[in-house]
A protein has these predicted regions:
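Intrinsically disordered, metal-sensing/regulatory segments
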Residues: 1-249
């Protein structure tokens, strides 16, 4: 095994485990009142919207123009819509949750897992370029970026009654595609490089659809909750935006 491939695998493992750090605080959260649960949905939605804009759409457009990204967004949203319709007709059960909560939890996991594929490609392409410095910068940036994404996975799961350690496990699981995608991207860097803008758009479309169709409606039931949810959503959005300003993916 070449040293470059070994570096790619190690970097991917680091970024995957970093996502689990975002779920770790929820191990120590024993009670999750409804008002905090709804604020959690909103905050996670804000994190996802900011990640969609600043780590997916803007870099994709800067790299290849708007058309590939727009096509990816459309396909990602259509895929999530089809998935939501399909899950709505199934008696799904996830981690002991009710049918409705299981459906939402699965949609969150599917969306964040999809989001991890282009990040894995980015890691593989960076190390495959032969610039070890670029690969290390990409690893650090994505690892730091993955911590709030682990929060985004864990918040809605913990709010619905999933245990803290399971939240950590599912956060790590949602980032596993980074390892899966990084290796072939490293081995075939020239073939995977043109796919990044489409993959970025696809992941952004899936996340934006989830936020608009599930997370925002779930966070708003009363007038008072609408205000607190808006504040939580803005806090999540601003936190991720500031993070992206420091570590651009």
């Amino acid at each position: 095994m070449s040293s470059g491939l070994t570096d790619t695998i190690i970097a991917s493992i680091v970024t995957v485990l970093a996502c689990g750090l975002g779920g770790l605080p929820f191990v120590f959260v024993k009670d999750f009142p409804e008002k905090w649960a709804r604020a959690g949905w909103a905050a996670a939605g804000g994190l996802m919207l900011a990640a969609s804009v600043f780590s997916l759409i803007i870099p994709g457009v800067a790299d290849a123009g708007i058309n590939p990204v727009a096509l990816g967004i459309l396909l990602g949203a259509l895929m999530m819509a089809a998935t939501a319709v399909w899950l709505g007709g199934q008696e799904v059960e996830f981690s002991g949750l009710s049918v409705d909560n299981s459906r939402r939890a699965l949609l969150v996991l599917i969306t964040l897992t999809i989001h991890s594929f282009p990040e894995g490609i980015a890691i593989g392409v960076a190390f495959g370029s032969g610039e070890i410095g670029l690969g290390l910068v990409m690893m650090i940036a994505i690892a730091i970026h993955n911590i709030p994404e682990g929060v985004a996975v864990s918040l809605p799961l913990r709010a619905q009654g999933v245990s803290g350690w399971k939240c950590v496990g599912w956060a790590i699981f949602s980032s596993m595609p980074q390892l899966i995608a990084a290796v072939p991207a490293y081995l075939a860097v020239m073939a995977f490089r043109p796919l990044l803008p489409y993959a970025f758009g696809f992941a952004a479309g899936a996340m934006i659809f989830l936020v608009l169709s599930e997370m925002i409606p779930e966070s708003r039931h009363t007038e008072r909750q609408r205000l607190s949810s808006a504040a939580a959503g803005m806090a999540g959005f601003l936190a991720m935006m500031l993070l992206q300003n420091i570590f651009v993916i």
